[in-house]
């Protein structure tokens, strides 16, 4: 079989499929019917046959194809339709953007400056909480680490 034919068959209901074939689905409870080996009478209608079928005693949720028209569903149940633009994580909301850009920041580091007001922490506040760079050994530029070299040279008896 031609590879293009395989791709076309695989994509029948996907993005590349026929744009005119619209199907609507709903996530609902489903109770499967037991399959009987008895041959049904040919005069029986399909609806009657569904009503007479014996059902299994369990149900599960699954995606079911809607038999109703999609337009009728939209008119009846507006609360189930979500606007996906409201939940798009790529779009920042204005309220979030204003909270991050409220204070002035240092141009070089992007950290909030010490003269910022209200709720944001300044660089001095953060340094005070974790200790200055002198409080952490090895991070201070003025400290010389010659003591470690001397201790390595001492021989044990």
From Swiss-Prot:
Keywords: Nucleus, Phosphoprotein, Transcription, Transcription regulation. It comes from Saccharomyces cerevisiae (strain ATCC 204508 / S288c). Interacts with STH1 and SWI3. Component of the two forms of the RSC complex composed of at least either RSC1 or RSC2, and ARP7, ARP9, LDB7, NPL6, RSC3, RSC30, RSC4, RSC58, RSC6, RSC8, RSC9, SFH1, STH1, HTL1 and probably RTT102. The complexes interact with histone and histone variant components of centromeric chromatin. Probable additional component of the SWI/SNF global transcription activator complex. InterPro entries: Rtt102 (IPR018304). The gene is RTT102. Probable component of the chromatin structure-remodeling complex (RSC) which is involved in transcription regulation and nucleosome positioning. RSC is responsible for the transfer of a histone octamer from a nucleosome core particle to naked DNA. The reaction requires ATP and involves an activated RSC-nucleosome intermediate. Remodeling reaction also involves DNA translocation, DNA twist and conformational change. Its main location: nucleus. This is Regulator of Ty1 transposition protein 102. Pfam families: Rtt102p. The modification Phosphoserine is found at residues 77, 122. One of its GO terms (cellular component) is SWI/SNF complex. Present with 1550 molecules/cell in log phase SD medium. Residues 95-157 are annotated as: Disordered. Residues 96-116 have a biased composition (Polar residues).
């Amino acid at each position: 079989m031609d590879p293009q034919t395989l791709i076309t068959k695989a994509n029948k209901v996907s993005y590349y499929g026929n744009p005119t074939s619209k199907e609507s689905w709903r996530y609902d409870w489903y109770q499967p019917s037991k399959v009987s080996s008895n041959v049904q009478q040919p005069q029986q209608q399909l609806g009657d046959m569904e009503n007479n079928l014996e059902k299994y005693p369990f149900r599960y949720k699954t995606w079911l194809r809607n038999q109703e028209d999609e337009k009728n569903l939209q008119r009846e149940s507006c609360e189930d339709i979500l606007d996906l633009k409201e939940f798009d994580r790529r779009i920042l909301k204005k309220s979030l953007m204003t909270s991050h850009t409220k204070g002035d920041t240092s141009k070089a580091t992007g950290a909030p400056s010490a003269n910022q007001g209200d709720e944001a922490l300044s660089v001095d506040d953060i340094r005070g909480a974790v200790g200055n760079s002198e409080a952490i050994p090895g991070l201070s530029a003025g400290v010389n680490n010659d003591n470690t070299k001397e201790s390595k040279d001492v021989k044990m008896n």
